[in-house]
């Protein structure tokens, strides 16, 4: 029991709370953000992923606008409160620590730290996707002309993609 408690205590509570939220598959019901969906049916004509991953693979729903506003905010507060109450018993803390965990200010600060962990992961997800998306490589004049037409048209996949990214990240 002591070794398990020591192992748990070695991870910050906010990390353990965020980990629990992920294990609960929070946001799994929210569609992932994908280049294919965001850029529309012409996406494969203008985009590719440097990693070779398909354009249909993207950001988990948890890390979208709806994931944050419709799932994370309320779930984070609830799971933080629950785990803060469980924490003293799980780790075998003395009574004064129990009282501190029940303090509203401490709970608010802990919720803020959980939000920070979420946002750090959010940024990593988005940076990884955006760094991986690039324009297709056109190796002849005909392909370059077609690429330019697709990019400059009224329903440009590039414009659609950028608008969708802005919508999801602001």
Predicted features and spans:
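Cytosolic/nucleoplasmic, non-transmembrane interface domains of endomembrane
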Residues: 1-170
């Amino acid at each position: 029991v002591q070794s398990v408690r020591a192992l748990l205590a070695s991870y910050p509570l906010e990390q353990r709370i965020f980990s629990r939220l992920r294990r609960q598959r929070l946001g799994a019901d929210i569609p992932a953000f994908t280049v294919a969906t965001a850029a529309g049916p012409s996406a494969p004509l203008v985009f590719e992923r440097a990693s070779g991953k398909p354009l249909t693979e993207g950001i988990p729903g948890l890390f979208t606008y709806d994931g944050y506003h419709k799932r994370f905010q309320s779930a984070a507060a609830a799971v933080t409160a629950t785990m803060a109450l469980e924490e003293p018993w799980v780790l075998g803390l003395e009574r004064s620590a129990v009282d501190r965990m029940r303090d509203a200010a401490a709970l608010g600060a802990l919720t803020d730290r959980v939000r920070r962990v979420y946002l750090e992961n959010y940024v990593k997800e988005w940076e990884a996707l955006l760094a991986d998306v690039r324009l297709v490589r056109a190796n002849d004049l005909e392909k370059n002309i077609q690429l330019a037409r697709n990019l400059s048209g009224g329903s440009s996949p590039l414009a659609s993609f950028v608008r969708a990214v802005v919508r999801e990240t602001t």
